[in-house]
Amino acid sequence: MPKRDAPWRSMAGTSKVSRNANYSPRAGMIHKFDKAAAWVNRPMYRKPRIYRTFRSPDVPRGCEGPCKVQSYEQRHDISHVGKVMCISDITRGNGITHRVGKRFCVKSVYILGKIWMDENIKLKNHTNSVMFWLVRDRRPYGTPMEFGQVFNMFDNEPSTATVKNDLRDRYQVMHKFYAKVTGGQYASNEQALVKRFWKVNNYVVYNHQEAGKYENHTENALLLYMACTHASNPVYATLKIRIYFYDSITN
């Protein structure tokens, strides 16, 4: 008379064969060769020429990867007369934050930070607006021109600033934005957050020097102008400015 099967044999999915197959340490080491995956992930030299010459839209025309990044972290004292900083200062080198040669393309600009007031200034009843201009200098020379030299204003008011007529072919305002802070004892807004991301595709050209300075630019320097509307109460801006750029293939 045959013995009766054990109770665990009648349970679905718990046979001895399946238990050995599932929990064996060698069960997960069997790899099946997938021809479709191998064809999709084939190396570049085995692809047609169109795949080797075509570049994705993420890479600007005439450039090559990888995407490099440079950060400018600084606290700015913004006054009524304005200030300027160059955000295309890239030193020549081999790192992920360096340019390979004379030419590169700034694909995008990311500005992150806040506008804030001093402890003594925020107690005064006033409203102060801080304005930013992202400007392209097509023919940089010497040192960056001051805010009052580039912009024409009515009654020295930065909110009415426009590029002077004789400099319109050299300076081009690519983007403009502002942030507002309010001081006072009751309805005060002592700080304002700043967050902007722009796609610019600005092709920068340097001379033979390696240092990342404005004076070494020959074409298309990126400048950030800042000014506040209040004449007597300055504000502070704690900003992290990141630019993402690609090296040119003609370097």
Curated annotation (Swiss-Prot):
Pfam families, per database record: Gemini_coat
GO biological process: symbiont entry into host cell; viral penetration into host nucleus
Ranges spanned by the short sequence motif Nuclear localization signal, renumbered to the chain: 35-49
Domain of life the protein comes from: Viruses
Motif (Bipartite nuclear localization signal): 3-20, 195-242
Keyword Transmembrane helix annotated: no
Ranges annotated as unnamed zinc finger: 63-80
InterPro entries in alphabetical order: Gem_coat_AR1 (IPR000650), GV_A/BR1_coat (IPR000263), Viral_coat (IPR029053)
GO MF terms, alphabetically ordered: DNA binding; structural molecule activity; zinc ion binding
Binding partners and assembly: Homomultimer. Binds to single-stranded and double-stranded viral DNA. Interacts (via nuclear localization signals) with host importin alpha-1a.
Similarity comment: Belongs to the geminiviridae capsid protein family.
Function: Encapsidates the viral DNA into characteristic twinned ('geminate') particles. Binds the genomic viral ssDNA and shuttles it into and out of the cell nucleus. The CP of bipartite geminiviruses is not required for cell-to-cell or systemic movement.
Name listed for the protein in its UniProt record: Capsid protein
Lineage: Viruses, Monodnaviria, Shotokuvirae, Cressdnaviricota, Repensiviricetes
